[in-house]
C-alpha cells in the first residue's frame, strides 16, 4: 500500500498543480469515475494486455465514463496508461481529494456509528468536531456498523477517535490478559 501511495503522489500533485481552483471539483469527479473503472478486474486485465495500446485503452476508458473528460484529465489518463500506472488511479484520486480539501481548509470525516445518526445528534457531533479541528469545514461520510454495539468511531485524516463499546471491550480484554 505504501508503495502505491509513493507511486501515486507525483501524479496527484502534477494534476492538482495543473488545475485551476475552479476546476478542482470537476477533476476530482472525473478522477473518481476513472478510479471506479480502474478497480474493475476486466479493465485491469485490459491494461495488462500488451496487445492493447495506451491510446486505445485511454479512448476506451474515456468512452466508459459518464462525464466527458476535460483536456487535463484526458491527457493525464493518457500519461497514466503510457506509464502502465492505471492500477494507481484509485490512490491518485484519494491523494488528489486530500490536496483539494487541504487547499480549501476542509477535511473528510468518516463517522461510523452503531446506530443511524440523524438530526440534532449528528449536528451536535459535527459541531463539536468542527471546534476540535480548528473550525475546518468537515465533509462527513456516515456509516452504520452494528458490530460496534454502541458509541461511535470517528476518523479525520490519520487521527482516529474510537469511543465504541466494541473498542472499550477490546481494551478491557487486553488489560485483563496482561
Swiss-Prot record:
Q: Which GO terms describe its cellular component?
A: plasma membrane; proton-transporting ATP synthase complex
Main subcellular location: membrane
Subcellular localization, as worded in the UniProt entry:
Cell membrane
Answer whether the UniProt record assigns the keyword Ion transport to this protein.
yes
GO MF term (any one): proton-transporting ATP synthase activity, rotational mechanism
Give membrane topology per the record.
Peripheral membrane protein
- What UniProt keywords apply to this chain's record, in alphabetical order? ATP synthesis, Cell membrane, CF(1), Hydrogen ion transport, Ion transport, Membrane, Transport
Entry keyword annotation includes Membrane: yes
Q: What role does this protein play?
A: F(1)F(0) ATP synthase produces ATP from ADP in the presence of a proton or sodium gradient. F-type ATPases consist of two structural domains, F(1) containing the extramembraneous catalytic core and F(0) containing the membrane proton channel, linked together by a central stalk and a peripheral stalk. During catalysis, ATP synthesis in the catalytic domain of F(1) is coupled via a rotary mechanism of the central stalk subunits to proton translocation.
Q: Which PANTHER family match?
A: ATP SYNTHASE DELTA CHAIN
User: Which family does the record claim for this protein?
Assistant: Belongs to the ATPase delta chain family.
Quaternary state and interactors: F-type ATPases have 2 components, F(1) - the catalytic core - and F(0) - the membrane proton channel. F(1) has five subunits: alpha(3), beta(3), gamma(1), delta(1), epsilon(1). F(0) has three main subunits: a(1), b(2) and c(10-14). The alpha and beta chains form an alternating ring which encloses part of the gamma chain. F(1) is attached to F(0) by a central stalk formed by the gamma and epsilon chains, while a peripheral stalk is formed by the delta and b chains.
Q: What is this protein called?
A: ATP synthase subunit delta
